[in-house]
């Protein structure tokens, strides 16, 4: 059975938590798909998350028991920030089990979708973020639509002839690719792309490792032939 999409009528107010970037972002989303409150804290995730949540709930005049769902960034991004946010959400949802609805979004998919929203004719573009030395998380954009989140290596980036975007991470293992346009991560624009939200049974984080052995390449897929 297909998972139910996010509904602003039944799943709000929703607490949005994003620890993937250089700062911790927290927001409270209301029924009109607009922010009731936003709080963004710089500094280490351990020191920033709870003050950001407290500030957002205070501005929205809500308590955790009144939250209908948790929306979180699954990554890729700061491993420490993502894990800390995941543990916090799991703890809070146990306090209010009837409200334990989880919706996830991918940081690269969010950024790629915003590129397409701002420039609907975007094509032959590549968005990358640092994963580890010699490897990058990447989303290819074609026909104004983002593809899947995959892993590419330095060679693919060096040979890329289209427009290249780079999404900075809290801690990078390598310098941004030459000729890449640096993006500002914008989780505050999430209400513009709520279709990205995926229902989860539990708080699950994105793992780049599952794509290592199926790296995306710019070549067209060729049909596999076998000798019978």
What are these regions (language model features)?
Residues 69-100, 107:
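DPxDG-like acidic metal-binding loop motif
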Residues 41-57:
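N-terminal phosphate-binding loop and adjacent alpha-helix
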Residues 65-74, 162-170:
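Short glycine-rich phosphate-binding loop at a beta-alpha junction
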Residues 19-23, 30-33, 69-71, 88-90:
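Long, contiguous secondary-structure blocks with strong helical propensity
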Residues 36-39:
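Short amphipathic
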Residues 53-69:
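Phosphate/pyrophosphate-binding loops at sites that engage ATP/ADP/AMP, CoA/4′-phosphopantetheine
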Residues 1-29, 44-47, 103-228:
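Oxyanion-binding and handling regions
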Residues 53, 88-92, 111-115:
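Buried hydrophobic packing segments
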């Amino acid at each position: 059975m297909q998972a139910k999409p996010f509904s602003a009528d039944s799943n709000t107010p929703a607490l949005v938590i994003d620890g993937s970037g250089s700062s911790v972002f927290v927001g409270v989303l209301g029924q009109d798909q607009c922010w009731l409150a936003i709080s963004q804290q710089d500094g280490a995730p351990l020191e920033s998350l709870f003050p950001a949540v407290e500030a957002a709930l205070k501005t929205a005049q809500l308590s955790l028991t009144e939250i209908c769902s948790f929306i979180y960034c699954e990554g890729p991004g700061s491993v420490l920030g993502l894990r800390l946010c995941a543990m916090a959400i799991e703890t809070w949802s146990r306090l209010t089990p009837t409200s334990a609805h989880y919706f996830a979004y991918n940081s690269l998919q969010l950024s790629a979708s915003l590129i397409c929203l701002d420039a609907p004719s975007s094509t032959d573009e590549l968005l990358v973020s640092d994963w580890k030395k010699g490897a990058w998380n990447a989303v290819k954009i074609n026909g104004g639509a983002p593809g899947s989140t995959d892993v590419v290596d330095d060679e693919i980036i060096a040979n890329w002839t289209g427009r290249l975007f780079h999404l900075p991470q809290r801690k990078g293992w390598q310098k941004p690719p030459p000729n890449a346009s640096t993006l500002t991560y914008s989780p505050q624009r999430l209400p513009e792309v709520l279709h990205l939200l995926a229902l989860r049974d539990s708080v699950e984080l994105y793992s780049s490792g599952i794509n290592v052995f199926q790296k995306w390449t710019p070549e067209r897929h060729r049909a596999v032939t076998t000798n019978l």
